[in-house]
């Protein structure tokens, strides 16, 4: 072949989705370069691994590249994209590059509106404990690995399948998981929920005849697509018709204790080192896949008991002092979470109530995208009204233009009318630490939450001397 790809360039390499693929390609021996608007821990890690990183986008950054990888967040007028077009360098969507990686191994793709990152991490951890040494590409940092991607020597690659832009339809895995189907990213589907469900049906059609669809039958929308799935199915969840089912579920000491009933295997007693019933569901998907791949029961149990979590998914920062008039006055427990859809937020609040019973729950929330705030406005009011104290910031736009009556102030006004919680509104995340310090008490549980820039706040809070 005359066109041999040796050098691959990533536009927006500092994002979690792009960086994972870039890291795997570095470890496969490719020359990798990339650019982003700012440096961060991800770009620093890739540079240490040997990738060439440029800060800022410029045509010269793609010099020598045989292919340029872009995500849907990259604009068509980006100077590197324009330069690639001018030089006839192939421009490859991120999902297509992930699909190429999947062609090298047997793919396990985790789809669903909520829970993808945690479920992907649990599957990768259980398979690793079973000696299968999978490659993984995750949308968050797997704490035990210190990274969101790893090149394994085994036959499997475990990755998230992104429905937000319908790019998961580029993937052709041998095992698929669908955790749930909910109304999010509806612009992609013309605000037609039937089109969204049809996309998930088409996703299952990507499986080969020997493939398996692992489906959570607790979710009514997943259950509705069952008749249209033409490949073998493993049903999981709490539902009586689940083939991998959790019973005797108890929350104790921030962990979930349950028994996994399996259709073709012995019951398995599990201690999951995560809180929340939604994480029991995520663990059941991992148990279903591990059982199918003949991972030993003891390895499944050990992996779930030792699971250290994923960055920004109910990530615990420990105890932080409460300062009052210049001196410490007790401490609060700090947790950070990526949740940005009302369903995810409700699951996290429920998990916190279960993990820390009887304690006051303080939430600092940054809404993500004006369109989501508009589309889920009443649901946001409902879930935010369930906490004991609230700091609310302006919406993180993610590049969107403001929408009238779908901003942070409108949300704060609606919450005051609802009358369940009095929000403290701040314009920027930089104001969150001071706003929290004015309301936090000894013994509180503080959760910082959102998919935007609020992710940098917990590290600032945790810099206070631990008690």
Swiss-Prot record:
Q: Spell out the SUPFAM superfamilies in the cross-references.
A: MurCD N-terminal domain, MurD-like peptide ligases, catalytic domain, MurD-like peptide ligases, peptide-binding domain
Give the GO terms filed under biological process for this record.
cell division; cell wall organization; peptidoglycan biosynthetic process; regulation of cell shape
Matching entries from Pfam families are given as:
Mur_ligase, Mur_ligase_C, Mur_ligase_M
Keyword Cell inner membrane attributed: no
Q: Which UniProt keywords apply?
A: ATP-binding, Cell cycle, Cell division, Cell shape, Cell wall biogenesis/degradation, Cytoplasm, Ligase, Nucleotide-binding, Peptidoglycan synthesis
| One annotated Gene Ontology cellular component of this protein | cytoplasm
> Record keywords: Cytoplasm included?
yes
Binding-site residues for ATP, renumbered to this chain: 112-118
Which InterPro entries does this chain map to? Mur-like_cat_sf (IPR036565), Mur_ligase_C (IPR004101), Mur_ligase_C_dom_sf (IPR036615), Mur_ligase_cen (IPR013221), Mur_ligase_N (IPR000713), MurCDEF_pg_biosynth (IPR050061), UDP-N-AcMur_Ala_ligase_MurC (IPR005758)
As its record notes, the protein acts as a catalyst of: UDP-N-acetyl-alpha-D-muramate + L-alanine + ATP = UDP-N-acetyl-alpha-D-muramoyl-L-alanine + ADP + phosphate + H(+)
Cellular compartments annotated: Cytoplasm
Any one Gene Ontology MF annotation carried by this entry is:
UDP-N-acetylmuramate-L-alanine ligase activity
- Functional pathway: Cell wall biogenesis; peptidoglycan biosynthesis
EC annotation?
6.3.2.8
The record's similarity note reads:
Belongs to the MurCDEF family.
This chain's function reads: Cell wall formation.
The protein's name is UDP-N-acetylmuramate--L-alanine ligase
Species the sequence originates in: Paraburkholderia xenovorans (strain LB400)
Upper classification of the source organism reads:
Bacteria, Pseudomonadati, Pseudomonadota, Betaproteobacteria, Burkholderiales
Encoding gene (name): murC
């Amino acid at each position: 072949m005359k066109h041999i790809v040796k050098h691959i360039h990533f536009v927006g390499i500092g994002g979690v989705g792009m960086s994972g693929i870039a890291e795997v390609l570095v470890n496969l021996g490719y020359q990798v370069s990339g650019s982003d608007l700012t440096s961060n821990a991800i770009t620093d890690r890739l540079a240490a691994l040997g990738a060439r990183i440029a800060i800022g986008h410029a045509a010269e950054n793609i010099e020598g590249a045989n292919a340029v990888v872009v995500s849907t967040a990259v604009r068509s007028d980006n100077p590197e994209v324009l330069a690639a077009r001018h030089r006839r360098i192939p421009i490859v969507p991120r999902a297509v590059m992930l699909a190429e990686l999947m062609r090298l191994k047997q793919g396990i793709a985790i789809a669903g509106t909520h829970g993808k990152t945690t479920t992907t991490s649990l599957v990768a951890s259980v398979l690793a404990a079973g000696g299968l040494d999978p490659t993984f590409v995750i949308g968050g940092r797997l704490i035990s690995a210190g990274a969101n991607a790893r090149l394994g020597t085994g036959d499997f690659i475990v990755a998230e399948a992104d429905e937000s832009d319908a790019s998961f339809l580029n993937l052709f895995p041998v095992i698929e998981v669908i955790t749930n189907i909910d109304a999010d990213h509806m612009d992609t589907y013309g605000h037609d929920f039937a089109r969204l469900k049809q996309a998930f049906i088409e996703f299952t059609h990507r499986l080969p005849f020997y493939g398996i669809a692992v489906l959570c039958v607790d979710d009514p929308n997943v259950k509705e697509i069952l008749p249209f799935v033409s490949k073998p199915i493993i049903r999981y969840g709490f539902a009586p018709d689940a083939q991998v089912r959790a019973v005797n579920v108890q929350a104790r000491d921030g962990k979930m204790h349950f028994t996994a009933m399996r259709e073709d295997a012995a019951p398995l007693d599990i201690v999951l080192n995560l809180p929340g019933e939604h994480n029991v569901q995520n663990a059941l998907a991992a148990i279903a896949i591990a059982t199918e791949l003949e991972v030993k029961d003891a390895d499944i149990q050990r992996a779930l008991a030792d699971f250290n979590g994923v960055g920004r998914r109910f990530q615990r920062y420990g105890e932080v002092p409460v300062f009052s008039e210049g001196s410490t006055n007790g401490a609060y427990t700090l947790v950070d979470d990526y949740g940005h859809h009302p369903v995810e937020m409700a699951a996290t609040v429920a998990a916190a109530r279960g993990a820390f019973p009887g304690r006051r729950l303080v939430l600092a929330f940054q809404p993500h995208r004006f369109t989501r705030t508009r589309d889920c406005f009443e649901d946001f009011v409902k879930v935010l009204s369930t906490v004991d104290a609230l700091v609310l910031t302006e919406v993180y736009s993610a590049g969107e233009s403001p929408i009238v009556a779908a901003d942070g102030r409108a949300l704060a006004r609606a919450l005051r009318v609802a009358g369940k919680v009095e929000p403290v509104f701040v314009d920027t995340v930089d104001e969150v630490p001071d706003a929290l310090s004015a309301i936090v008490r000894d013994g509180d549980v503080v959760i910082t939450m959102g998919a935007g820039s609020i992710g940098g706040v917990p590290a600032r809070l945790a810099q206070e001397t631990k008690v």
